[in-house]
């Protein structure tokens, strides 16, 4: 019994360690990045033809007066006709605060903060080179709206050069979607071939993530290549070394809690992914596509997709089979993915995320019931063996080797596995951690209500009722399990304090996770009563 108590304590503390370690290793906020001189020189070498990280950022509000406003059922976008950059993106179906009407704004420029998406054509005949400056497009209107019954909205920006080449930058919006098609149509009406190369980049002022120990979040960049499915590239990484990754297809992104912006170039195109950081603290991640030759009299379209919205796994997977990995479940992703699927399935049935979490808990506990029963049977047998084990200790005294051999023979004779009570606990720990990351990373749970005072399962209980109930249930479970009479007094005190320690620990956990743990405890108490009643009939106490 003593060994199982110790293992329970170790298992619970192990969870705490893993969560803390995960936060410390790659989630903790980092200070503002300092850019080394070597990195700046390398940046100039890689991206000498791409507009600098500071280019295209209006210094005053007056510079943004002629922005083009685009409104769909999902997005409110502002496009600067200089370069055709997306300088503002509000997500109309995601509120900034739960009980307010103001939408969540992902891309914006205000005060000393800038977060924009830029794209253009560079190369020999490009219109957006670092040397010549950004293209100045003309638009037929200053506002576009996706009308009722309309599924697609195109916003064309046009520029014709003195040589007779017409460049049309077309933004394509679709109903119900957060991805924006960006097409460059190059109509070469000149007498000479035109050579251009598309690029896209996301620029963001370096800021620390709004993170806490119980709610660790990542704010920074990420990318994917043909060889590397998903890799984070933090602001700190950018300051130390510029990225330069040639690949077929791929994507680049800027991540934050629940939301993402990403450039997804053509999958069949040869691209170079790159990063840079300006001396002013503006981080940049982007791609450069392959060179396109447009013959005289010909027209060619060069395309990429820009996503600006929530970390919706289905929507992201539709753009790239690896883009959904920005929903980062950590090292237990292989367990978190099916848990998320089960959670989504139950929610589709009951239309309440809290009830869905309860159903997931019942499912997990039901699947683990045979192991749970085996655990309590093993614990009961171990309790019955305590007098015989004490006799062995008295007989062999300090001869640990002989006493160990005698104990193993006794276990074999009585058909008792001393480790039999550990397996259910060890299995529940990964499930707990995986569910923690599901609740932390899944945007579906943002502002998701349960009932009564729990109106957002993704944040802590505002009145701490669930953590207190969880602590009480943990105390009740502990009282139901007989304490070994020969347990060390210090260990007894530690176990007695565990419910209170974990109550404090859970005060800042998301309410959804505390709900899972509370319901799990209540189910465990019920299972204990059933199993103990069965054991008493068999003469095991």
Curated annotation (Swiss-Prot):
Keywords: Cell inner membrane, Cell membrane, Chaperone, Membrane, Protein transport, Transmembrane, Transmembrane helix, Transport. The chain crosses the membrane at residues 6-26, 326-346, 349-369, 420-440, 457-477, 500-520. Gene3D superfamilies: 2.70.98.90. Its main location: membrane. GO terms for cellular component: plasma membrane. It holds the Pfam family 60KD_IMP. GO terms for biological process: protein insertion into membrane; protein transport. It is a multi-pass membrane protein. One of its GO terms (molecular function) is membrane insertase activity. It is found in: Cell inner membrane. Required for the insertion and/or proper folding and/or complex formation of integral membrane proteins into the membrane. Involved in integration of membrane proteins that insert both dependently and independently of the Sec translocase complex, as well as at least some lipoproteins. Aids folding of multispanning membrane proteins. HAMAP family: YidC_type1 (MF_01810). PANTHER family: CYTOCHROME C OXIDASE ASSEMBLY PROTEIN COX18, MITOCHONDRIAL (PTHR12428:SF65), OXA1 (PTHR12428). Interacts with the Sec translocase complex via SecD. Specifically interacts with transmembrane segments of nascent integral membrane proteins during membrane integration. Belongs to the OXA1/ALB3/YidC family. Type 1 subfamily. This is Membrane protein insertase YidC. It comes from Shewanella amazonensis (strain ATCC BAA-1098 / SB2B). The gene is yidC.
């Amino acid at each position: 019994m003593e060994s199982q108590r110790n293992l329970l304590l170790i298992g619970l503390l192990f969870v705490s360690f893993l969560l803390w370690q995960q936060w410390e290793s790659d989630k903790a906020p980092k200070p503002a990045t300092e850019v080394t001189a070597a990195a700046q020189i390398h940046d100039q070498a890689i991206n000498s033809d791409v507009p600098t990280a500071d280019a295209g950022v209006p210094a005053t509000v007056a510079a943004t007066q002629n922005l083009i406003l685009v409104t769909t059922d999902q997005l409110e976008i502002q496009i600067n006709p200089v370069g055709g950059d997306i300088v503002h993106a509000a997500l109309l179906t995601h509120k900034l605060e739960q009980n307010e009407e103001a939408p969540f704004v992902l891309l914006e420029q205000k005060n000393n903060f800038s977060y924009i998406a830029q794209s253009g054509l560079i190369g020999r005949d490009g219109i957006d080179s670092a040397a010549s400056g950004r293209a100045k497009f003309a638009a037929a209107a200053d506002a576009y709206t996706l009308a009722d019954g309309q599924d697609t909205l195109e916003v064309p920006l046009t520029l014709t050069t003195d040589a007779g080449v017409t460049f049309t930058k077309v933004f394509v919006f679709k109903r119900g979607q957060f991805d924006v098609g960006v097409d460059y149509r190059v109509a070469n009406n000149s007498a000479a071939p035109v050579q251009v190369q598309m690029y896209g980049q996301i620029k963001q002022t370096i800021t620390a993530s709004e993170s806490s120990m119980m709610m660790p979040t990542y704010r920074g960049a990420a990318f994917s290549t043909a060889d590397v499915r998903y890799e984070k590239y933090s602001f700190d990484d950018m300051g130390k070394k510029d990225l330069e990754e040639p690949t077929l297809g791929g994507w680049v992104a800027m991540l934050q809690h629940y939301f993402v912006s990403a450039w997804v170039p053509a999958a069949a195109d040869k691209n170079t992914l790159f990063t840079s950081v300006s001396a002013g603290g503006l981080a940049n991640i982007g791609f450069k596509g392959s060179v396109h030759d447009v013959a005289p009299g010909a027209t060619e379209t060069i395309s990429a997709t820009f996503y600006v919205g929530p970390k919706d796994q289905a929507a992201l997977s539709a753009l790239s089979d690896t883009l959904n990995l920005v929903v980062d479940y950590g090292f237990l992703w292989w367990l978190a993915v099916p848990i998320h699927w089960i959670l989504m399935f139950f929610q589709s049935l009951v239309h309440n995320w809290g009830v869905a979490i309860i159903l997931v808990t019942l499912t997990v506990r039901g699947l683990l019931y045979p192991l749970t029963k085996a655990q309590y049977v093993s614990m009961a047998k171990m309790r019955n063996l305590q007098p015989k084990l004490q006799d062995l200790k008295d007989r062999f005294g300090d001869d640990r080797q002989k006493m160990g051999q005698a104990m193993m023979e006794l276990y074999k004779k009585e058909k008792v596995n001393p480790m039999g009570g550990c397996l259910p606990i060890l299995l529940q720990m990964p499930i707990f951690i995986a569910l923690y990351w599901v609740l932390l990373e899944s945007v579906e749970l943002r502002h998701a209500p349960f009932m009564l005072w729990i109106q957002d399962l993704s944040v802590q209980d505002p009145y701490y009722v669930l953590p207190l109930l969880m602590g009480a249930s943990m105390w009740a479970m502990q009282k139901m399990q007989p304490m070994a009479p020969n347990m060390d007094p210090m260990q007894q005190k530690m176990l007695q304090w565990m419910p209170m320690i974990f109550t404090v620990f859970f005060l800042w956990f998301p309410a959804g996770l505390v709900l899972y743990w509370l319901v799990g405890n209540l189910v465990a108490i019920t299972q204990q009563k059933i199993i103990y009643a069965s054991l008493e009939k068999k003469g095991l106490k």
